[in-house]
Amino acid sequence: DLTKPTENIHLNSYFLDISNSYVSEHNIYLFDQDYEYGNYAPPISSLFGLKGAIGPFVYNSDDLYTSRSITKVSKFKILEDGSISFATQGKVEGKTINQYSFDEHNGQLRLALYDFQGSRIVILDENLKEIGKTLDLAKGETMYSSRFMGDKAYLVTYQTVDPLYVVDLSDPTHPRALGELKIPGYSTYLHPY
């Protein structure tokens, strides 16, 4: 309270490694992009330089690399008196691009994420548990911009031509892509009007 400069101030400190943040009317979300390293299982012949000496080594290429990009989410509640209280933590697969990759709607956190599998929207409940997500869109493309507006999300990915995806979020447990529009060039910023 700036009108009472001699009043004691109570502070809470939290030490986190963050790459982005989002503040809604009632919550503060802090995000940390990370990478979980999985198991790498190279073919035996490449380990020892042997070609066929121990016979063919069969492996499932889907299991070869199990590393993945993740986004860790820390949620803090903004209390009535203006103080902040830690609420919960969670994580989702994929990474975000900027502050427009997040949105809180009806108490649910919505995130636009991408990785090598594609782009997607993931919806988390107030305890940061996943309640819905889209299928991976634009496999092999990078997400360049995203924007949430009410029950819709808009994503722009890029490879050669910029597809603009429209995603219906009216049912948070079953978000779905409504369609895409291919436009030349690429957009790194979407602005509602």
Task: Provide a role label for each language-model segment.
Residues 1-193:
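Beta-sheet-rich non-transmembrane sensory/scaffold domains
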